Amino acid sequence: MGYNTPKQTVSQFQLKDRYARQYLSFAGKSSKDFLLYLSGPGVYDSPAADVESTSVPGRNGDILTENAKVGRRRYQNVDIKYKAFFFNGLPAKTAAVKAWLLSPVGYQKLQDTYDPDFFRMAVCKDALAFDVTAQKAAEMELAFNCKPQRWSVDGQRTIRLDGRSTLKNPFAFPAQPIFKVYGDSGGELYVGEEKITIHSIKDYVLLNCETHNAYNASGFCNETILSDDFPELPEGKTQITWTGGITAVEVIPRWWTL
């Protein structure tokens, strides 16, 4: 006589534990805090280059105008959508999620467990709630408008340099690092072929190569800096050295890709 295995009923909480592996974090909070999980990775198109084309009668091909610094390319923002769900979905939960996602002002850090080595800077455009399913699993679609860069988590770590050093950018896009220059008097910082003269240093000077600003403990100190431009770290290797009263340099390289 055959033996039939008893049919087992899987509770919603068991299902939740089984699928509660993928989530996102935004503005310092995790979707796990709301028992909200992702059904799949974010869906998006590659960022479009900011290029204008002009047709000229009688001439083959368009004239292209890059809306960027000479020799560089600018990329436009990209929309990313996630399908998400939580069990025993209640209006209160949906309201809490919307408050979390839609209340922050300005760009916020967005990261998900499908791509844990990278993050984006994003603003939530919408969090649409769907009807609760027969299994009591409420679904949402989360839409974010993101800057084009996928920032490397590893590229946000501080690297301390105590002497002549070489940094290697693993990506095809030039990075705009943050330097923290320590010293007891003025000196010159060399980043590749770029030279930055710092006329005076009191403990340290912070150089933000994205915003083109210099800071110390008292605030802005751009007047103490002399340079043709703030340096970037192109793809491949860049040598960093210094002279004068500079004693050490810390750098956050801020690597990124698309």
Question: Model segments located where?
Answer:
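Compositionally biased P/S/T/G-rich terminal and signal peptide-adjacent segments
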Residues: 50-62, 69-74
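Intrinsically disordered, low-complexity segments enriched in serine, threonine, and glycine
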Residues: 152-258
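Polar/acidic, low-complexity leader/linker segments enriched in S/T/G and N/D
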Residues: 1-58
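Short amphipathic beta-strand/extended segments with alternating polar/hydrophobic composition
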Residues: 23-39, 119-126, 195-202, 226, ...
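Oligomerization/assembly interface segments of phage tail-like spikes and tubes
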Residues: 64-89, 136-150, 238
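Short, acidic/charged, Gly/Pro-enriched secondary-structure junctions
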Residues: 8-12, 83-125
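Short beta-strand and beta-hairpin "edge-sheet" elements
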Residues: 45, 109-150
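Solvent-exposed loop and beta-edge segments used for protein-protein assembly and interaction
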Residues: 74-78, 102-104, 134-138, 171-173, ...
